[in-house]
């Protein structure tokens, strides 16, 4: 990163603030720019000012910065076709993502995980596995702190488990992780990427710069992701829960098996784990691949897996009320994630709460499963009318429209009885009602616990 030209970090969220702080710590003149008014922590503002930078707000400020800056660092929430991004490119600035910045500042090892669903669970498991190595490790990216901030204290021999979204992978040019994982690809974020092709191209950036010294881990069971094996220059490792692989990570009779260079090693059996659902089997397979190529022992990987509990907001058990279990799956921000949640409950009888900020993805595949698995579908949020139309078209019975989030939970409680389960799995982002999916999930849990305590009728 040049010390001659100023750097603009676009977006004052978690990633943007982290990137700006790291650059300022390295004595780089950096301006944190935001379209709307915002307030910085006094310590961060003083740090930026100490290197000749600061906080910039509004269009006029942005355009003036283009005269002194050579690099524009994008926070994940800033789209590549944003007018200011295009203007910066026209003015000759190099535009990179916060992940690319972090990679350039870090010389250590990275296991990078992307995919439409399963990223957080897989990355969290990998992070626990990396802790078993005799070197420092951390978890960052789309989970926890900004990647550039997380790697600041890691040494050259350290390991980072990085969860990466398609947004974070849009503007990378030299990013080359030691291990690159693609879990799956299904429609998501089409309001930003516009087409599945563009969405997939962003995901591929995770392995584009890899060579023979790196490993590309792909889901053999995903028909799209499987074909990407022909495009990587890294060593290819497939994982599969359906096929026995001569070279790769697979399942057989419930066992997770590593087959590599003619040797087979069993890590553990699915019956030993606290995770359930086919999607989690895929997550475990991918995590085993990461652990294996990072040098984690079989016994350590097995121990991590046996002790790992489901992450918060992903099919998270909340409470049992009158024999009816309630589950929080607020992290299901797209239809495929909700499909995986529905499939995890093999007996069906689900009271499903869905809806929120509409991502405009196709609904028919999900609604076909909703018709099969649910006893009632409760719709809420900005997406409820489109969801209702799709559900009716697919013949889903017992559709209920809720006036609010609270009304949806109350209606679910009124309808539910043994042997049913109540599942919040919105298939939508949360931005119509909440700051993010954790806030939505925590509010759901609060309402359920109030019902459990008899405080809400």
Regions found by a protein language model. Give the residues of each.
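Short internal beta-strands
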Residues: 29-36, 216-220, 351-354, 373-382
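Beta-strand->loop->alpha-helix junctions that form or flank phosphate-binding loops
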Residues: 56-59, 96-100, 233-251, 302-306, ...
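N-terminal leader/targeting and accessory segments in enzymes
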Residues: 1-97, 101
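Nucleotide phosphate-binding/pyrophosphate-handling subdomain across enzymes
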Residues: 3-6, 16-26, 268-375
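Phosphate-binding loop of NTP-binding sites
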Residues: 4-6, 24, 63-67, 76-220, ...
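Short beta-strand "acidic-cap" motif of Rossmann-like dinucleotide-binding folds
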Residues: 30-34, 139, 161, 238, ...
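Residue-level signal for inorganic ion chemistry
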Residues: 23, 72, 113, 142, ...
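C-terminal helical cap/extension that packs against the catalytic core
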Residues: 43-49, 364-420, 455-457
